[in-house]
UniProtKB/Swiss-Prot annotation:
GO terms for biological process: prolyl-tRNA aminoacylation. It comes from the Bacteria. Pfam families: HGTP_anticodon (PF03129), tRNA-synt_2b (PF00587). GO terms for molecular function: ATP binding; proline-tRNA ligase activity. This is Proline--tRNA ligase.
Length: 439
C-alpha cells in the first residue's frame, strides 16, 4: 500500500480527555474516531489490526475444535425472559421496540440465543460434544465509558459456547478453551495470566479471567511471579489428549482478581514472588452447567433414552479491547511497537528522495519483491521531510522500517531498522528480503 493512497489521519497531539496511552496512541495514529460516548469508527489502520487479531482468535478456536457461526446483534426479549435474565442486566442492556411494539434488545451477550439454536437442532447425545462460536459486535450501556476501546459501549467479542452430556465432558471442554486462550494471547505477544474470578450475571461455579498486567489496568490483581515465566501450551498441543495436568499446573499457582483475593494465601508466598499489580481483562471463561439449559429446556436424549439438560460453558475474548491491551503492553516514548503477528503492516518502506530515479527504482523493486513474498508493506513515497517520515513510522509502530536514500542506493544498500530494539543495519538490497523473511 502506497502511503499517498492510504487514509492515515495522523495527529501530533491527542485530545486532552484521552487518559491512557492506548487511547492517546489510537487517536494519534488515526486508528479510531470517536462518534459518541464509548462508540468508535474503526479507521483503516485500526481495522487492519482488528482483523489480524480476529484471525488469530479464529485459528486458535478452530484448532481447539470449535465451529464458527454468526448470530445477530438484535435479540428477542422473550428469550431473556425465558432464562430469567431480562431484568438482571438493568440499564446496562439497551432495550428496543420494533415497529410492531415487540420488545427487542441489542445483545450484551449470547447465552440465550445460542441455547435457542441448540435446542432447535440438537436432540441426541450422539450429536455431542459441540462447541459453537462467533465474533460479533455487542453493546453495553456503561454508566461511564472511558479509556477508549478498553471500556467502550460498543465492542467486538468472540463468544464460544460448549454443550456436553456430562459435567466431566463439560469440564474437559473448559480445559480446551483454557489452553486455546493461552495460545491465542501468546501469539499476540501477550502474557495472559488465568485468574479465578467471580461469575457475575453469567452464573456458574467455575470461572477464570485472563489478565494482562498493565499500570492502567482497571482492577487490582494478585499472583505468583512464577506465572509470568510459564510458556503457553504451544501450537502442537493435542486437544484430544487429557489437558488436566497442564491446567492443574497453571492453576496451582496463586492468582486472583480483587473479588476473589485471599490475603492470607497471598502472604504465604515468599515476598519476592508476590506480584500485586493492575490488570486488564482480555478474556473470561465460565462453566455454568445447566443454568440456561434447564429453564430453556435445552435437552438431549441420553444413552438410556432419558431426556437430560445439557452441560454448558461460555468463553469470551474481548477482540476490540485487545488492541488497547496490546498497545498498553507494547509502546515506548515514540509510539506503538506492534508485535509482528498483529501489526497493520509488516514493513514500512521509506523513500528518502521521491523523484530520484535510483531511489524510485530501488523502492519499486523492493516493494514488489516484499509483496510477492507475502509481506504487507506500507510504502512512504510522500514528499514530507525526513524527520516527519521517521516520526510517523515510529508512531504507527510497524515491526520493520526499510529506508532507501541516494547515498545508500549508489552503494547498493538500504538501512533496515528493528522498531522494537531500535537497532539499524545497512543491508545489501539483494540480502534485505532474506533478512526480513528470517525475522
Amino acid at each position: 500500500m502506497r502511503l499517498s493512497k492510504f487514509f492515515l489521519p495522523v495527529s501530533k497531539e491527542a485530545p486532552a480527555d484521552a487518559a491512557i496511552v492506548s487511547h492517546q496512541l489510537m487517536l494519534r495514529t488515526g486508528m479510531i474516531r470517536q462518534n459518541g460516548a464509548g462508540i468508535y469508527s474503526w479507521l483503516p489502520l485500526g481495522y487492519r489490526v482488528l482483523k489480524r487479531i480476529e484471525q488469530i482468535v479464529r485459528e486458535e478456536m478452530n484448532r481447539a475444535g470449535a465451529i464458527e457461526m454468526l448470530m445477530p446483534t438484535l435479540q428477542q426479549a422473550d428469550l431473556w425472559r425465558e432464562s430469567g435474565r431480562y431484568d438482571d442486566y438493568g440499564k446496562e442492556m439497551l432495550r428496543i421496540k420494533d415497529r410492531h411494539e415487540r420488545d427487542m434488545l441489542y445483545g450484551p451477550t449470547n447465552e440465550e440465543l445460542i441455547t435457542d439454536v441448540f435446542r432447535t437442532y440438537v436432540k441426541s447425545y450422539k450429536q455431542l460434544p459441540l462447541n459453537l462460536y462467533h465474533q460479533q459486535w455487542k453493546f453495553r450501556d456503561e454508566v461511564r465509558p472511558r479509556f477508549g476501546v478498553m471500556r467502550g459501549r460498543e465492542f467486538l467479542m468472540k463468544d464460544a459456547y460448549s454443550f456436553d452430556l456430562t459435567e466431566e465432558d463439560a469440564r474437559a471442554a473448559y480445559r480446551k478453551m483454557f489452553c486455546a486462550y493461552l495460545n491465542a494471547f501468546d501469539r499476540m505477544g501477550l502474557t495472559a495470566i488465568p485468574m479465578r474470578a467471580d461469575t457475575g450475571p453469567i452464573g456458574g461455579d467455575l470461572s477464570h479471567e485472563f489478565i494482562i498486567l498493565a499500570d492502567t489496568g482497571e482492577s487490582a490483581v494478585f499472583c505468583d511471579k512464577a506465572l509470568l515465566d510459564l510458556p503457553a501450551p504451544g501450537l502442537d498441543l493435542d486437544f484430544e489428549s487429557d489437558l488436566t495436568p497442564f491446567v492443574t499446573e497453571r492453576t496451582g499457582y496463586y492468582a486472583a482478581t480483587e473479588e476473589m483475593h485471599d490475603e492470607a494465601a497471598f502472604n504465604a508466598l515468599p515476598e519476592d514472588r508476590r506480584v500485586s499489580a493492575r490488570g486488564i481483562e482480555v478474556g473470561h471463561i465460565f462453566f455454568f452447567g445447566t443454568k440456561y439449559s434447564k429453564p430453556m429446556n435445552a435437552v438431549v436424549q441420553g444413552p438410556d433414552g432419558q431426556m437430560v439438560p445439557v452441560q454448558m460453558g461460555s468463553y469470551g475474548i474481548g477482540v476490540s479491547r485487545l488492541l488497547g491491551a496490546i498497545i498498553e503492553a507494547c509502546h515506548d516514548e515514540n509510539g506503538i511497537v506492534w508485535p509482528e503477528s498483529v501489526a497493520p503492516f509488516d514493513v514500512g518502506l521509506i523513500n528518502m528522495r521521491p523523484g530520484n530515479e535510483a531511489c524510485d527504482a530501488a523502492c519499486n523493486t523492493l516493494y514488489a519483491a516484499l509483496t510477492a513474498a507475502g509481506r504487507e508493506v506500507l510504502y512512504d513515497e510522500t514528499d514530507d521531510r525526513a524527520g516527519a517520515k521517521f516520526a510517523r513510522m515510529d508512531l504507527i509502530g510497524l515491526p520493520w522500517q526499510t529506508t532507501v536514500g541516494p547515498r545508500g542506493v549508489t552503494e547498493g544498500k538500504v538501512e533496515v531498522k528493528n522498531r522494537k530494539t531500535g537497532e539499524k543495519h545497512d543491508v545489501k538490497i539483494e540480502d534485505m528480503l532474506a533478512q526480513l523473511k528470517g525475522s
